C-alpha cells in the first residue's frame, strides 16, 4: 500500500492483479481502522469502484468529487496517502474526509451530504467556459441522493444537458437503512436487470410497429409509453434528462470498466447506477443491518467487538431519547423525528415502542424541521433529534416555519460543541450564534445528565413556543439521576460556587473546567464565583444585574464561537443597560474552522482549558496576598 504514490499504478494492472489489490486494500483498511476508528463500512464497499474510477479517469485532471466524503479512504490510498493512515482522524493527521490542502486529487471538500452534484455542475460549466476537456465525475450514494439539494441539482443538470458522469453508489444505506419513494425506485431498478439492454430491445420492438395512419400511430405511441414505464424504472433519471446505465455490479471490474468506457463516449449527463455492498469483505460490517458499522471507534478484528473506553455516565444521546420515550408513555402528543440518524440519536427504543410516532425522514433536514412545524400546528409535541452541524442546513425552516409562527417544537441539538475526529465539517460550534437572535426561541444547555433529564422534561412541558436543548457528544459525568423529573424555571441560572473577587459565567461542558479553575485559584487567595448560565436565551436578567452592580470582573467561557455567542450576549446586555465600566472578557472558539483531533487536544490548541481560565482570571483580578 505504501508504495502507491499515484493512481496511474492501477492503469496497467490485469484484472487478477486488481482483484489482489482490492483484497490487500480491504485487509489494510480493516487493520488500520481497528486502531484509529473511522468510516469502515462505506469504504469497504467502494474498493473496486474507486480502483475502476482511477483506472478509467485521469485524476487530478479529471475531477472525482466524493459526496459526503466518508467513503474516500480508498481514493486516499490510491493517491499516495497510505503511509499516513496511522494518523487517520488524529490531531494534525490525515483527515477522514477529502481535503484540498492535503492532495491535488481532492478537488472538493465534503462532510455534509448531497453537495457533490451542484459542485460538479459548477466545475463542468467552468470547464466549458474555459474550453477544456476534462471529465467531471461526482460519486454520490443512494442515501445522499434523497437530499433535496441533490434533487435540485439533478433537475438543473438535466435541463442544461451538462456533460458529466454521475456515479450513483447504491448500497441501500446512508448511515441507517434508507427510506423514501426514491429508495423504492432504486430498489425496483436493482431487480430490473440491465436497463440499457432492455431499452435497446424495447426500441427494436417498437420500430417493428407500423406507424400507418393517425390512429395506429397514436396507439403505437401509447404502447411505447406503457412498455417504457412497465419495463424500465430507469425512466426516472431519463425523464430528468440523463442517460441511465446500469445496474452495474460494483464489485465486478469488467462490468465497471465496460459501463464507464461507454459513459465516457456519451454526450450530456450520464448516470451510472452501481450496486455495492457496504462493509464488503469484513463480516461484522457486511452483515450490519442498522448502521452500527458505518463509522466506528477502535475494534477487535477477530470478534468485531468494539474497544470500550471507560465512560462515567450514560450516553447523552441515549439519556435524551430515553427520557423522551419515558414521557411519551403518558403523553400521546410526543412524536420523534430524525433526519437519517436513528442510531446516532439512540432512537431505536423509541421507534420500537412507538413505531407510529417515529419518523426517519432520510437526509432531509429542511423537511424534518417543517414537518415538525406542521405537527405542532395540530397540537402535537414534535421532538426533533438533530446534530448541531446538520441543523445549519435547516436554518430558514427554523426561522420562517417554526420560530416565526411560535410553534411548540423541541429541538434536541446533539453533538453541540467540539466533536473531535470528524473535524471542521462536524464541529457543533455555530448553533448558539445562529439561534440566539431568533425571536421566540428558548435555548438552553445542561451542566450534567441529571440537569439534562430535567431540561428534557421542561422542554416537553413547555407550551409557549419553540425550545432547544443543546448537549455534547459522548457520555455524561456519572452523576446520580433523580427519580422524579421536574421543570426548571425558564431563564434561570444557578450559582455553583460563591466568590467575591471575580465571576465565571459558563454552561455545559465548560462548567467542570471552570470549577477546577476556581479550586486552583482559591489556593492563591482568589475567590471566584462560578455561575451555571444554563439558559442562553432568555438569560437570567436578575442575576446579570446583580453581578454587574457588584462590579466583579466577569469572564464568560463557552465551547462555541465567540462571534455572536453567549459572551457577546452578556456584553450586549451590559452595554444596553448602562454598565459601561464593567470588566467583561470572553473565552471560546476563535474565528476559524477547527480541524480534527481529540477534543482535549483541540481545547488545548485554542486555549480553552482550566489552566487557560486560571491565567485569564489572574490578569483580570488585582494581585492579592495568599490567604492563610
Curated annotation (Swiss-Prot):
Coiled coil: none annotated. Its cofactor is Mg(2+); thiamine diphosphate. Keywords: Isoprene biosynthesis, Magnesium, Metal-binding, Thiamine biosynthesis, Thiamine pyrophosphate, Transferase. Gene3D superfamilies: 3.40.50.920, 3.40.50.970. Belongs to the transketolase family. DXPS subfamily. GO terms for biological process: 1-deoxy-D-xylulose 5-phosphate biosynthetic process; isopentenyl diphosphate biosynthetic process, methylerythritol 4-phosphate pathway; terpenoid biosynthetic process; thiamine biosynthetic process. Binds 1 Mg(2+) ion per subunit. Catalyzes the acyloin condensation reaction between C atoms 2 and 3 of pyruvate and glyceraldehyde 3-phosphate to yield 1-deoxy-D-xylulose-5-phosphate (DXP). It comes from Geobacillus kaustophilus (strain HTA426). Homodimer. It catalyses: D-glyceraldehyde 3-phosphate + pyruvate + H(+) = 1-deoxy-D-xylulose 5-phosphate + CO2. Pfam families: DXP_synthase_N, Transket_pyr, Transketolase_C. Mg(2+) binds at residues 142, 171. Pathway: Metabolic intermediate biosynthesis; 1-deoxy-D-xylulose 5-phosphate biosynthesis; 1-deoxy-D-xylulose 5-phosphate from D-glyceraldehyde 3-phosphate and pyruvate: step 1/1. This is 1-deoxy-D-xylulose-5-phosphate synthase. One of its GO terms (cellular component) is cytosol. Its EC number is 2.2.1.7.
Amino acid at each position: 500500500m505504501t508504495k502507491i504514490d499515484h493512481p496511474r499504478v492501477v492503469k496497467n494492472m490485469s484484472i487478477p492483479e486488481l482483484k489482489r489489490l482490492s483484497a490487500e486494500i480491504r485487509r489494510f483498511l480493516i487493520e488500520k481502522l481497528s486502531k484509529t476508528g473511522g468510516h469502515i463500512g462505506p469504504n469497504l464497499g467502494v474498493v473496486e469502484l474507486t480502483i475502476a474510477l482511477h483506472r478509467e479517469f485521469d485524476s487530478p485532471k479529471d475531477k472525482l468529487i466524493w459526496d459526503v466524503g466518508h467513503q474516500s479512504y480508498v481514493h486516499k490510498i490510491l493517491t499516495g496517502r497510505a503511509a499516513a493512515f496511522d494518523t487517520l482522524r488524529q490531531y494534525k493527521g490525515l483527515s477522514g474526509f477529502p481535503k484540498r490542502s492535503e492532495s491535488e486529487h481532492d478537488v472538493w471538500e465534503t462532510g455534509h451530504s448531497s453537495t457533490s452534484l451542484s459542485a460538479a455542475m459548477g466545475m463542468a460549466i467552468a470547464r466549458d467556459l474555459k474550453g477544456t476537456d476534462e471529465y467531471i465525475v461526482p460519486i454520490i450514494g443512494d442515501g445522499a441522493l434523497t437530499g433535496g439539494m441533490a434533487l435540485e441539482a439533478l433537475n438543473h443538470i438535466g435541463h442544461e444537458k451538462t456533460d458529466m458522469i454521475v456515479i450513483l453508489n447504491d448500497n441501500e444505506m446512508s448511515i441507517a437503512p434508507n427510506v423514501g419513494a426514491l429508495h423504492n425506485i432504486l430498489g425496483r431498478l436493482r431487480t430490473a436487470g440491465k436497463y440499457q439492454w432492455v431499452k435497446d430491445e424495447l426500441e427494436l420492438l417498437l420500430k417493428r410497429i407500423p406507424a400507418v395512419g393517425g390512429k395506429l400511430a397514436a396507439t403505437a405511441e401509447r404502447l411505447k409509453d406503457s412498455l417504457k414505464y412497465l419495463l424500465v424504472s430507469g425512466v426516472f433519471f431519463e425523464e430528468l434528462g440523463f442517460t441511465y446505465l446500469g445496474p452495474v455490479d460494483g464489485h465486478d471490474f469488467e462490468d465497471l470498466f465496460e459501463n464507464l468506457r461507454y459513459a465516457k463516449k456519451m454526450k450530456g449527463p450520464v448516470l451510472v447506477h452501481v450496486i455495492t455492498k457496504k462493509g464488503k469483505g469484513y463480516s461484522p460490517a457486511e452483515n450490519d443491518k442498522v448502521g452500527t458499522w458505518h463509522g466506528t471507534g477502535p475494534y477487535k478484528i477477530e470478534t468485531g467487538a468494539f474497544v470500550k473506553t471507560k465512560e462515567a455516565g450514560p450516553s447523552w444521546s441515549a439519556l435524551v431519547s430515553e427520557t423522551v420515550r419515558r414521557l411519551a408513555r403518558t403523553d400521546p402528543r410526543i412524536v420523534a423525528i430524525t433526519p437519517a440518524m436513528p442510531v446516532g440519536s439512540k432512537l431505536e427504543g423509541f421507534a420500537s415502542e412507538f413505531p407510529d410516532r417515529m419518523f426517519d425522514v432520510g437526509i432531509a433536514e429542511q423537511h424534518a424541521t417543517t414537518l415538525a412545524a406542521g405537527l405542532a400546528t395540530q397540537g402535537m409535541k414534535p421532538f426533533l433529534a438533530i446534530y448541531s452541524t446538520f441543523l445549519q442546513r435547516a436554518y430558514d425552516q427554523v426561522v420562517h416555519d417554526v420560530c416565526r409562527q411560535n410553534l411548540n417544537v423541541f429541538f434536541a441539538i446533539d453533538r453541540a460543541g467540539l466533536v473531535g475526529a470528524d473535524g471542521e465539517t462536524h464541529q457543533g460550534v455555530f448553533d448558539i450564534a445562529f439561534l440566539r437572535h431568533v425571536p421566540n426561541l428558548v435555548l438552553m444547555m445542561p451542566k450534567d445528565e441529571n440537569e439534562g433529564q430535567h431540561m428534557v422534561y421542561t422542554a416537553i412541558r413547555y407550551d409557549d413556543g419553540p425550545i432547544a436543548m443543546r448537549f455534547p457528544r459522548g457520555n455524561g459525568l456519572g452523576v446520580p439521576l433523580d427519580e422524579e423529573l421536574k421543570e426548571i424555571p425558564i431563564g434561570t441560572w444557578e450559582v455553583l460556587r460563591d466568590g467575591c473577587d471575580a465571576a465565571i459565567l459558563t454552561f455545559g461542558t465548560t462548567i467542570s473546567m471552570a470549577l477546577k479553575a476556581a479550586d486552583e485559584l482559591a489556593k492563591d487567595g482568589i475567590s471566584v464565583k462560578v455561575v451555571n448560565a444554563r439558559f442562553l436565551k432568555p438569560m437570567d436578567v436578575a442575576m446579570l444585574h446583580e453581578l454587574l452592580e457588584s462590579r466583579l470582573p466577569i469572564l464568560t467561557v463557552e465551547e462555541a464561537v465567540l462571534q455572536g455567542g453567549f459572551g457577546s450576549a452578556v456584553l450586549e446586555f451590559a452595554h444596553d443597560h448602562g454598565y459601561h465600566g464593567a470588566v467583561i472578557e470572553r473565552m471560546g472558539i476563535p474565528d476559524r474552522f477547527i480541524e480534527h483531533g481529540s477534543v482535549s487536544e483541540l481545547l488545548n490548541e485554542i486555549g480553552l482549558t482550566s489552566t487557560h481560565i486560571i491565567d485569564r482570571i489572574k490578569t483580570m483580578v488585582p494581585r492579592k496576598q495568599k490567604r492563610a
